[in-house]
Amino acid sequence: MKFISLVFVSFLLNYSASAQKKEYAAPDAHAARLGALISLNVATIADTLTRPFEDNAQKARAIYYWMTHNISFDLKATKGNDNKNIKPEIVVNTRKATPLGYATLFQEMSSMANIRCLTVDGYVKRSTSDINNIADEINHSWVVVQLGKTPTEWYYIDPANGAGYTDEAIKNFTPDFTSEYFFANKTLFDLSHFPDNMAWQLGGTKGPQTKKDFFGLPVFCNSAFTTGVGNIKPLTGYIKAKTKTPVFFSFNTSTDSTISSIALIAGDDRHPSAPVPMNFTNNGGIISFSYQFKREDSFPLRIVVDGKVVMEYMIEITE
């Protein structure tokens, strides 16, 4: 019975991911057709994007698609935690933003479309150097939107992460549209984002309850959302193990397609090892594998699923 339940849950997650793509095909196509909308002000852009749609979710999606394809990530300002140019008109004119700039513009456009939207400030981990290294200052922002009147009808949207990702040093930005940061999975979002105000942790008590708990978790990359990982083990970001003892990993997945490869990469961006292919099992959507590390060392460890880094750990191996 337990196996059947897991298969059913996996089916529902797969169906949900597929349904989302179909549901937002129209606003995505509309925003893509409009292009950059150069020389238009914020109000005109918001109206042009949302006018064809009556449903607030589709309006919000059109805004999300347009922003993630037409606003670039401001690396210098983000690295310096400089948020002086976050006003919506400045972001639209310069076509670049910090995470708070993305969130502020999204909130402004949503309000113009009569969608209730609030900006949430908080924390993310961008690399394994952040694990167990509690940040003193807020380093990220996202939004929550309300489509109904109940607490369960608030949804996460992260337009900055949806546009792409940076390297560890925040020197390079890779555009990489991630659909799944729109109405993001609340459980996974709570593992990868920590709000400054706990009232905006929408997944409830399943997520980390303190900053210390949050910074003790693994790093979850954009591909964790596209893969739909859940029930991750181990859920501690810093792993200690012996050379003679295998380390076991497992997670659920909600991807539509079958996973064909899993690999481990040791080392940071500057000195990564060659990917080490894993023998893994897929039992009703539960991916499991293990690896025995052969020498004493401490290093970042990346889990790569079908060629994309999904999550990262720090690992310490002793004899």
Can you say where each PLM-predicted feature lies in the sequence?
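Bacterial Sec-dependent N-terminal signal peptides
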Residues: 1-22
